[in-house]
Every structure is written in structure tokens, then in C-alpha cells.
Swiss-Prot record:
The gene is Arp2. Hydroxynaphthalene reductase-like protein; part of the Pks2 gene cluster that mediates the formation of infectious structures (appressoria), enabling these fungi to kill insects faster. The product of the Pks2 gene cluster is different from the one of Pks1 and has still not been identified. Belongs to the short-chain dehydrogenases/reductases (SDR) family. It comes from Metarhizium anisopliae (strain ARSEF 549). Signal peptide: none annotated. Its EC number is 1.1.-.-. The active site is at 147 (proton donor), 148 (proton donor), 162 (proton acceptor), 166 (lowers pka of active site tyr). NADP(+) binds at residues 25, 45, 71, 98, 162, 166, 195, 197. This is Hydroxynaphthalene reductase-like protein Arp2. It is an enzyme of class 1 (oxidoreductase). The keyword Repeat does not apply. GO terms for molecular function: oxidoreductase activity. The keyword NADP applies. Keywords: NADP, Oxidoreductase.
Amino acid sequence: MASSEETPRSLAGKVALVTGAGRGIGKGIALELAKRGASLVINYNSAEKPAQEVVDEIAKTGSRAVAIKADITKVPEVSRLFQEALQHFGHLDIVVSNSGTEVFKPEEEVTEEDYDRVFNLNTRAQFFIAQHAYVHLRNGGRIVLMSSVAANMSGIPNHALYAGSKAAVEGFTRSFAVDAGHKKITVNAIAPGGVKTDMYDANAWHYVPNGKPGMPMEEIDKGLAAFCPLGRVAVPQDIGRVVAFLAHPDSEWVNGQVILLTGGSVT
């Protein structure tokens, strides 16, 4: 488990917007940024209560936060999200595009609706979040996009749709890093492996050799931890800490990179 040492408020005065921050990895990212003093915009689409609970949890750290509902698959909603964030806090310094969905489906069964649903959220939405971040961030800002270990992973069946949706984000990252350079904005992506969230609970068995639906979670954790030199699977805090580093001024020379977050796992 990630340690819980007290962290310095190294992001005091910064404002961060995190999409899909009401739960899972997004929540973990938001809390780590808040612990370092950043003010947070907690974006959510449907789960208002969990998002407000994150706002309340952030308040206990001494940082400020607001929850803003927006369906980021719709560009007008993305525009409104940024405008409301700016109206609330006055400026933006950090944008983390976290929202996503995962799918495992035999390729011959993938429908046009499946394709649109996955690419609209995992790919198209991330492009327009990054576009709006580029426009609205102050000079020296930070953009962090969400890829996945799956983007460059072979041997996982029925995963082409998801893997492709994340691979495109890695291309966005390298190109946006060039385009945003004149504003001294860095653009990076993170590519986590399995992280203990509700999405992990539903899908992690696919990554376990000989995994089956309904496998006990203890077996799944043990199976995946066996591939990791650190002997465990990730928790959202692990991902949040890396994003907190990328958000910090000290990370300025890290730009246009896709950072694999697997604890050294080899699968």
C-alpha cells in the first residue's frame, strides 16, 4: 500500500481541473493535488453525490474545491465546464483528463455504437479537453492525459477497441506538447496498469492468466501482484502522486512523454 507521509503544500495557489474525479483514479488524483495545496474543480457527469463527497474530503485537507457537472463527450459541455471553472477560481494551471471507459468484446461483435461510445469518451473527449486546456491555462501550465498500459500491450484478447482508443491519446500527447510549447505548457500522458477501482473490480480478471468471470478478488490481486516486483497492485494514490509530480514546477523538463505506471510489472 502507498505510504501516507505528510506532503508539503507545493501546489498552493494553483488551480487544477480533473475530469471524472468523483471516483476511482480521478478521485485519487484530485486528493493528491489537494493535499499539496491546489484548488480543485471536480468534474462529474452523473454521480453528483460521490463528487460532492470528494469536495468535502478536499475541504478537510485545507484546500478548496467545487464540483461541476459536464458531459465531456459534448464539446459545448466542455466549453461550459472550463468557463464555470474560470468563473469560480479565476484561472487554471493544471488540467487532468482522466475520464474513460473500458470494454472487452470479441471483435466480430463490436458494433458502431460500441465504437462511438468508447472513442467518444476515451479519445475524442480527451482531444477537446486538451484543446480547451491549451487555450485557457496560464503560461507554464500542465496538461496530463490518460492512456493505458493496454495501448502497447499484446496478448490480451477482445481488447482492440479499448487499446486503440488509448493509443490515439499517446499521439495527441506528443503533438500537443509541440503546439503548447510557446506558452511553456507541458503535455504528458500517464499509462497505468491495473488500479484498484470499480473498473478494476469489473475487468481485472481479463489480465490474469486463465482468468475467469467471477474469480475471487483475492485471486485476481494475487495473480496480478505476481507480475509486479513490488508484490502488489496499484491504488489510486499511486497514480495521483505521479500526476502531482507532473503538475509541479520541478517537472518542467518532462514533456511530450507517456509514463508507464505499472510498478515494474511485466506481463
